[in-house]
A protein has these predicted regions:
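Short, Lys/Arg-enriched N-terminal segments with co-localized hydrophobic residues
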Residues: 37-54
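Catalytic-core signal marking the mid-to-C-terminal active-site face
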Residues: 57-61, 66, 76, 300, ...
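Small-residue-enriched flexible segments
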Residues: 241-302, 319
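Phosphate/diphosphate-binding glycine-rich loops and adjacent basic-rich segments that engage nucleotide
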Residues: 202-271
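Active-site cofactor/substrate anionic-group-binding motifs, chiefly glycine-
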Residues: 105-152
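Short, well-structured alpha-helical segments
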Residues: 81-92
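A generic, well-ordered mixed alpha/beta core segment in the N-terminal half of proteins
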Residues: 135-224
Length: 389
């Protein structure tokens, strides 16, 4: 059943044989830091956030220690146990993929948003079956992850039975690493596409006022026996917004071609890029893809346009209201049974060439390395998350 698949999927992500550290009495007694210490109320992109100080020292966590820290921080800040499970695995998967700055770093924001009322960690998403293959999920201003997981319980069996199924999510939140969600569907044997809109940081070609966000897209290709042949997960801008933000916090410049200043001129100053706009990947073509994402994730879902969404940075208690779109296709039914063979040939045509790699290969290499070495987390950020826990 679908429920059994979801349980098995989450269990398979767990790393056996690793002991959990007991939470110390001191961390249990510690109080969550004031939200104002974590978020800039005046949206100053130069603010030093926990976990980004240049001089911070790193700790290294086992996957089980990291899982416990993530889960306990979410619960401590006000997430229900049911809503925290899938979310915890997504954040852990992000860290194990080596996507530094997208896992632990954003978790402190998630916890702060819980305390400020920007997101509801306990709400139960509402599912509306528009037809046998189309589903709308109202996240009800809660986290995206529980809403996506709840929707997948309908999307997966519908795609398996009918060959294709679509799901939209509205009144939602940051979907974080999209590849976790599309990979989830691919491991269920489905060809998957996902997208999300976010707050505007990209101006239209020739303009200087942002109208769409980095608007990431992801697709995942299934392989036999619950594996993933390859997976693509990328923003529709040259780099992610987090990359610019981290450059500001670390006092680094950026290459020309990543961002524009407020007048629409190229800049190597990441702070000017954050107050100006980001460059779409491939110029006009990248903007067009970002525009498609905006249509799929706002007009089609019933969610707000990026220009109408709440701020992820400002601590104002206002919901963010992102939208998400997912498409799942049963590949054997649609291909006449030759999908796996064709994908195998496609993969071989790439990997047989020297110096090439499949999309997502680096993340898999990072996973193996971090399973051996431990997952790094800066001491200050670790203490912040422990306090939330």
């Amino acid at each position: 059943s679908t429920d059994r698949f979801l349980r098995v999927f989450l269990l398979e992500l767990r790393i056996p044989g690793l002991e959990k550290d007991e939470t110390t009495e001191a961390s249990l007694k510690s109080k969550p830091p004031k939200v104002s210490h974590l978020l800039s109320q005046n949206h100053d992109p130069t603010t030093k956030f926990p976990g980004r100080s240049i001089m911070s020292s790193n700790l290294f966590l086992t996957p089980e220690d990291a899982r416990k820290l993530i889960h306990d921080a979410l619960l401590g800040a006000g997430t229900s146990p049911e809503n925290a499970e899938y979310f915890t695995e997504a954040i852990l998967d992000t860290e194990l993929s080596g996507l530094e700055g997208h896992g632990f770093y954003w978790l402190q924001y998630y916890c702060s948003h819980l305390l400020s009322g920007k997101v509801d960690g306990k709400v139960i998403p509402k599912i509306d079956a528009v037809s046998k293959t189309c589903f709308r999920v109202d996240a009800l201003h809660g986290f995206a992850h529980p809403a996506i997981e709840a929707g997948f319980r309908h999307l997966i069996p519908a795609a398996r039975e009918h060959g294709i199924s679509v799901m939209t999510v509205y009144n939602s939140y940051n979907a974080a690493t999209l590849g976790f969600h599309t990979g989830y569907l691919a491991r269920a044997g489905l060809l998957a596409f996902g997208a999300t809109n976010v707050a505007p940081v990209v101006a239209p070609p020739g303009g200087n006022i942002p109208v769409i966000g980095t608007n990431p897209i992801s697709f995942a290709v299934p392989a036999p026996e619950g594996e993933v042949a390859f997976l693509v997960d990328q923003s529709t801008t040259e780099v992610s917004w987090t990359t610019l933000k981290r450059a500001v916090e670390q006092g680094e410049s950026i290459p020309f071609g990543w961002a524009l200043d407020a007048e629409g001129k190229p800049t190597n100053d990441p702070e000017q890029g954050l107050t100006g706009s980001m460059v779409p990947a491939g110029g006009v073509k990248g903007f067009n893809i970002g525009l498609l994402v905006e249509v799929l994730c706002s007009a089609l879902t019933g969610a707000k346009l990026g220009t109408q969404q709440g701020s992820f940075i400002e601590e104002d208690g206002q919901p963010i209201d992102n939208g998400q779109f997912f498409l799942a296709i049963e590949p054997q039914m649609q291909s006449g049974g030759i999908f796996d063979e064709t994908i195998s040939d496609l993969v071989a045509s790439i990997t047989e060439q020297d110096g090439t790699r499949l999309p997502n290969a680096r993340r898999q290499e990072n996973r193996q390395r971090l399973l051996r070495q431990g997952i790094p987390i800066e001491k200050e950020l670790f203490e912040t998350l422990q306090a939330f826990a």
